[in-house]
Protein backbone atom coordinates (compact mmCIF):
# COMPACT_ATOMS: atom_id res chain seq x y z
CA UNK A 1 0.00 0.00 0.00
CA UNK A 2 1.33 3.42 -0.94
CA UNK A 3 0.54 6.60 0.90
CA UNK A 4 -0.16 9.49 -1.39
CA UNK A 5 1.96 12.61 -1.12
CA UNK A 6 1.51 16.13 -2.41
CA UNK A 7 3.76 15.50 -5.39
CA UNK A 8 3.47 12.55 -7.74
CA UNK A 9 7.26 12.52 -8.14
CA UNK A 10 7.93 12.16 -4.41
CA UNK A 11 6.93 8.85 -2.84
CA UNK A 12 7.57 9.38 0.88
CA UNK A 13 5.44 7.75 3.54
CA UNK A 14 3.54 10.07 5.83
CA UNK A 15 4.62 10.20 9.46
CA UNK A 16 1.89 8.82 11.70
CA UNK A 17 1.75 8.45 15.47
CA UNK A 18 -0.22 5.32 16.31
CA UNK A 19 -1.58 5.01 19.83
CA UNK A 20 -0.36 1.79 21.42
CA UNK A 21 -2.98 -0.66 22.59
CA UNK A 22 -3.09 0.10 26.28
CA UNK A 23 -5.30 -0.93 29.13
CA UNK A 24 -7.88 1.55 30.37
CA UNK A 25 -6.53 3.90 33.02
CA UNK A 26 -8.75 2.29 35.66
CA UNK A 27 -7.04 -1.09 35.09
CA UNK A 28 -3.62 0.21 36.19
CA UNK A 29 -2.52 -0.26 39.80
CA UNK A 30 -0.80 2.69 41.45
CA UNK A 31 2.35 2.11 43.43
CA UNK A 32 3.25 4.41 46.30
CA UNK A 33 5.96 5.95 44.12
CA UNK A 34 3.62 7.13 41.36
CA UNK A 35 4.49 4.36 38.89
CA UNK A 36 1.36 2.67 37.51
CA UNK A 37 1.37 -0.99 36.47
CA UNK A 38 -1.00 -3.19 34.49
CA UNK A 39 -0.20 -6.90 34.17
CA UNK A 40 -1.31 -8.26 30.78
CA UNK A 41 -0.04 -11.76 31.55
CA UNK A 42 1.40 -13.16 34.77
CA UNK A 43 4.59 -15.12 34.24
CA UNK A 44 5.22 -18.50 35.83
CA UNK A 45 9.01 -18.42 35.96
CA UNK A 46 11.59 -17.19 38.45
CA UNK A 47 10.68 -14.04 40.41
CA UNK A 48 12.88 -10.94 40.15
CA UNK A 49 14.58 -9.43 43.19
CA UNK A 50 17.10 -6.62 43.58
CA UNK A 51 20.30 -7.78 41.88
CA UNK A 52 18.52 -10.08 39.40
CA UNK A 53 19.75 -9.97 35.82
CA UNK A 54 16.73 -9.29 33.57
CA UNK A 55 16.37 -9.77 29.84
CA UNK A 56 13.35 -7.92 28.44
CA UNK A 57 11.72 -6.76 25.26
CA UNK A 58 10.14 -3.33 25.51
CA UNK A 59 8.50 -0.52 23.60
CA UNK A 60 8.43 3.03 24.96
CA UNK A 61 6.11 5.94 24.16
CA UNK A 62 5.68 9.51 25.29
CA UNK A 63 2.49 9.62 27.35
CA UNK A 64 1.48 13.01 25.95
CA UNK A 65 1.21 12.11 22.26
CA UNK A 66 1.98 8.35 22.08
CA UNK A 67 5.07 8.93 19.97
CA UNK A 68 7.28 5.84 20.17
CA UNK A 69 10.82 6.76 21.15
CA UNK A 70 12.44 3.32 21.51
CA UNK A 71 11.82 -0.39 20.97
CA UNK A 72 14.03 -3.40 21.58
CA UNK A 73 11.77 -5.38 19.25
CA UNK A 74 12.48 -3.00 16.37
CA UNK A 75 16.18 -3.37 17.15
CA UNK A 76 15.62 -7.14 17.21
CA UNK A 77 17.69 -7.38 20.36
CA UNK A 78 16.41 -7.84 23.92
CA UNK A 79 17.68 -5.44 26.57
CA UNK A 80 19.56 -6.78 29.61
CA UNK A 81 20.22 -5.05 32.92
CA UNK A 82 20.73 -5.69 36.63
CA UNK A 83 17.65 -4.78 38.67
CA UNK A 84 17.94 -2.21 41.45
CA UNK A 85 21.43 -0.98 40.61
CA UNK A 86 20.46 2.31 38.94
CA UNK A 87 21.37 1.11 35.44
CA UNK A 88 17.89 2.02 34.15
CA UNK A 89 15.39 4.76 34.96
CA UNK A 90 14.07 4.55 38.51
CA UNK A 91 10.56 3.71 37.28
CA UNK A 92 11.84 0.48 35.75
CA UNK A 93 13.64 -0.57 38.95
CA UNK A 94 10.37 0.00 40.83
CA UNK A 95 8.01 -1.66 38.33
CA UNK A 96 10.11 -4.71 37.50
CA UNK A 97 10.82 -5.80 41.07
CA UNK A 98 8.92 -8.94 42.16
CA UNK A 99 7.75 -9.89 38.66
CA UNK A 100 8.13 -13.36 37.21
CA UNK A 101 9.81 -14.50 34.05
CA UNK A 102 7.20 -14.56 31.29
CA UNK A 103 5.27 -11.55 32.60
CA UNK A 104 3.90 -9.05 30.08
CA UNK A 105 3.08 -5.67 31.52
CA UNK A 106 2.36 -2.03 30.83
CA UNK A 107 4.04 0.65 32.91
CA UNK A 108 3.23 4.35 33.24
CA UNK A 109 6.17 6.28 34.65
CA UNK A 110 6.01 9.90 35.81
CA UNK A 111 8.78 12.18 34.57
CA UNK A 112 10.42 12.39 38.00
CA UNK A 113 11.09 8.61 37.85
CA UNK A 114 12.13 8.69 34.19
CA UNK A 115 14.39 11.38 32.70
CA UNK A 116 12.95 14.33 34.65
CA UNK A 117 13.89 17.88 33.78
CA UNK A 118 16.82 16.65 31.67
CA UNK A 119 14.87 14.71 29.04
CA UNK A 120 16.87 12.91 26.33
CA UNK A 121 16.83 15.01 23.18
CA UNK A 122 18.72 12.37 21.17
CA UNK A 123 15.80 9.97 21.74
CA UNK A 124 13.08 12.58 21.28
CA UNK A 125 12.17 12.63 24.99
CA UNK A 126 11.44 16.21 26.07
CA UNK A 127 11.97 17.61 29.55
CA UNK A 128 9.45 16.51 32.17
CA UNK A 129 7.91 13.83 29.95
CA UNK A 130 5.79 11.05 31.43
CA UNK A 131 6.46 7.73 29.69
CA UNK A 132 4.56 4.54 28.89
CA UNK A 133 6.22 1.17 28.36
CA UNK A 134 5.09 -2.28 27.31
CA UNK A 135 7.55 -4.81 28.74
CA UNK A 136 7.87 -8.57 28.36
CA UNK A 137 10.18 -10.25 30.88
CA UNK A 138 12.02 -12.90 28.86
CA UNK A 139 14.48 -14.08 31.50
CA UNK A 140 15.23 -13.61 35.20
CA UNK A 141 18.56 -14.90 36.51
Name the predicted role of every residue range.
Residues 1-141:
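Cross-family detector of peptidyl-prolyl cis-trans isomerase
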Amino acid sequence: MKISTSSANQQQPAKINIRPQLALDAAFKQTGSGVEIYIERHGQGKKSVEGSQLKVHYEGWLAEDYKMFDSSRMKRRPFEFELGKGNVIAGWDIALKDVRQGTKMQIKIPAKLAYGSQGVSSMGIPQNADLIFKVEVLKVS
